[in-house]
């Protein structure tokens, strides 16, 4: 299955020597989608030997520095790589993302040899579906932070089941366009008889659902957007002893993150966006322990810089 999730960074506020700022990249059927682009994201791409030229879309959650300061560098890198990029780059984010980037491009006189397509989200007005093709769709949800902030949902479409050649032949369905339409999930009329895909296709293969959620305070409705998702990468900025600070700063504790995914019956939960105060492994494992105590059957793990998750049937395997 051609579906990988790469963890480029896991920290909040500022990068550390062993922890870059929170950023996640999806590789899906030869194309890449980048979620957030803080300082040093470019370094993570280099370390993990990921081609920036394959990035077709960059989705920014909000206009705080630790989520956008690497964006200009990526745009410049794409332009300076031998003038080979021909595909447009789509950048999605809240109102202001275009002004932020275009102002910097103008001031620094950046030469671009490719088109940037901006899609600025007006929360509660922009339609939830941001992008859709035959394989997938990308939606946004409103989060609760000190400025406009967006969570992203990557939803793979269901796939038709295996084509039963013997059944097709027994129904005298000829090879060619009619079989192709059935394989694509469409009904056909053959010799006056309606044939539905379920007659010759095996069980539908459910598509995978992934969510990227940071930065946000806890709110009840959040779990409704990610019901039964296969994997949710969600901020876990603080341990529970700092829950009041988390509430004040509109962030989550690891325990609250687990409450959200437990309520949503999420299959796998990845914790991310750790406070810079947690520099020791024991601090991070305390975060993990608090989340696991809240959701013991939640398949909860710590996201780590350089981690790669590979889709395997209905779950993601950490490589």
Swiss-Prot record:
Coiled-coil region(s): none
Residues involved in Zn(2+) 1 binding: 62, 64, 145, 215
The UniProt record lists the keyword Iron: no
Enzyme class: hydrolase
Cofactor binding note: Binds 2 Zn(2+) ions.
One Pfam family named in its UniProt record: Lactamase_B_2
Source organism: Borrelia recurrentis (strain A1)
EC number: 3.1.26.11
Name of the protein this chain belongs to: Ribonuclease Z
